[in-house]
């Protein structure tokens, strides 16, 4: 069981593949070129059980129509479907805080605060994903903060958007307010991890770093200081594979 980072970042788009030992794949977002997704899953498109879509923005949805044309089911919120202008096809609305099955995986969506460039609220889901081979993985991206606490659930893996460092924000950039109200800062990321850290946590993958307001070395160092040596902390990069096995065999 592993996760492969197919694409990550504010400009390159975001897509991550969870793959079980049987070859079954679930995609987290599909925000890059369809051909890149195909390469990222070794062209095993028939093994994809579905896509968990967080929100409507292009860096998370670029390939959604091609994914649907391939007969793959996309799961997301009803508002996101409406805002994407999709009226038919292999897309299903899922309800917040309600478990559903996606192949041998299960998932439950929860709302996260996000904004669009026009400063309007943007419906956005994070997902708690479970599989017998990996335990519990939490995926959350493009959020200013998260009001939910997951400590009692004893997460095993965390894939979290760590977009920017406060001191690197360019307030002369007209989009700077969207960046801080629609994305997670390093300090917020650290606080979330502190609040939800247990001995069960095995891996943290930091994703969706800003191209001009992030410092990967600083982020890696400070997150490692929070969790210690028993948790594998990595910066997501295209092609990275993260071992998600719950057991060492």
Segments predicted by a language model, with ranges:
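Active-site environment of divalent metal-dependent phosphoester hydrolases
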Residues: 57-61, 81-83, 116-118, 145-148, ...
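Cap/insert and terminal regions of metallo-dependent hydrolase folds
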Residues: 148-237
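Conserved catalytic scaffold of divalent metal-dependent phosphoesterases
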Residues: 98, 104-114, 131-135, 143-145, ...
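Divalent metal-coordination and catalytic microenvironments
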Residues: 18, 29, 55, 107, ...
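Metallo-beta-lactamase
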Residues: 76-134
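Short, polar loop motifs at secondary-structure junctions
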Residues: 33, 77-83, 95-97, 143-145, ...
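Active-site metal-binding motif and surrounding structural segment of the metallo-beta-lactamase
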Residues: 33-79
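Conserved beta-strand hairpin/beta-sheet module of binuclear metal-dependent hydrolase folds
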Residues: 1-43, 123-142, 157
């Amino acid at each position: 069981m592993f996760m492969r980072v197919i694409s990550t970042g504010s400009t390159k788009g975001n897509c991550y593949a969870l793959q079980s030992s049987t070859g079954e794949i679930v995609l987290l977002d599909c925000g890059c070129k369809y051909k890149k997704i195909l390469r990222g899953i070794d062209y095993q498109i028939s093994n994809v059980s579905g896509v968990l879509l967080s929100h409507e923005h292009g860096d998370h949805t670029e390939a959604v129509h091609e994914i649907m044309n391939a007969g793959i089911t996309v799961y997301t919120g009803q508002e996101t479907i409406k805002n994407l202008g999709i009226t038919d096809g292999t897309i299903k609305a899922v309800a917040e805080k309600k478990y559903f099955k996606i192949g041998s995986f299960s998932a439950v969506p929860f709302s996260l605060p996000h904004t669009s460039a026009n400063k309007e609220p943007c419906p956005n889901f994070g997902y708690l994903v479970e599989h017998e081979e990996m335990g519990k993985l939490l995926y959350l991206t493009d959020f200013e903060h998260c009001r939910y606490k997951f400590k009692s659930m004893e997460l095993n893996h965390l894939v979290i958007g760590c977009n920017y460092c406060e001191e690197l924000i360019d307030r002369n950039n007209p989009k700077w307010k969207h960046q801080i109200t629609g994305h997670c800062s390093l300090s917020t990321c650290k606080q979330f991890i502190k609040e939800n850290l247990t001995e069960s946590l095995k891996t943290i993958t930091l994703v969706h770093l800003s191209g001009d307001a992030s410092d990967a070395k600083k982020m890696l160092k400070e997150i490692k200081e929070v969790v210690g040596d028993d948790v594998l902390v990595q910066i997501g990069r295209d092609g990275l594979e993260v071992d998600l096995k719950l057991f060492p065999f």
